[in-house]
Amino acid sequence: MRDRFEEQALALGAAMQALGLVRELATAGRLDDAQAEPLMSSLVKPYEGDLDRLYGGPTALAPGLRRLVTQLTNPQSMESTRYLAGVMHLEKKLSKNRAMLGQLGEGLEAARRQADYFHPLHENVLRNLGALYGETISQLGPRIMVRGDPGHLQDERIAAGIRTMLLAAIRAASLWRECGGGKLTLILRRQRLVQAAHALLERVD
């Protein structure tokens, strides 16, 4: 069985990978399919207690794990810190809202069927998941204010991708909490998480 800190690092790495894609979409208007695929998998596949199976292991989340190490050891972007704090705050609020969790679950089930018909990164799937985020988590507040190129942010397709990646980050934060993560973990066990992330990266193919 994987070390619990490695489980936490894997989930946090997924969150950081999703937030990195939020920034890329907002500033450059593009989505890296290879990085997005494991994150979409976490939204359209049921979680059966195995993060490796859900995400595809450390190799699929290597970019996010590297971002996590940087964030925990030498944070260079206050934007990343703000996004991550916002995601964790919204996930905590969501966890206490049973009605919204039910609505979100129904929406994700519909997305699973759609992804089976098309594929997880199909434009229709991204659009519907983005709409689901807007109808649920965005209503919790406070909203995560994404900065970027105004032209990209006003593009409906790109905006849907941003919301979908935020949803994937919320999903990862939920899994991190299920693995025992919390605010004190980031404060008191920061170095242990860094070591766990390094250990995972050493196994990258």
From Swiss-Prot:
Alphabetized InterPro entries for the sequence: HflD (IPR007451), HflD-like_sf (IPR035932)
Name used for this protein in its record: High frequency lysogenization protein HflD homolog
GO CC terms of this entry: cytoplasm; plasma membrane
Organism whose genome encodes this protein: Alkalilimnicola ehrlichii (strain ATCC BAA-1101 / DSM 17681 / MLHE-1)
Topology term for the membrane: Peripheral membrane protein
Family according to the record: Belongs to the HflD family.
Pfam families given in the database record: DUF489
Keywords tagged on the record: Cell inner membrane, Cell membrane, Cytoplasm, Membrane
Species lineage: Bacteria, Pseudomonadati, Pseudomonadota, Gammaproteobacteria, Chromatiales
Location in or out of the cell: Cytoplasm; Cell inner membrane
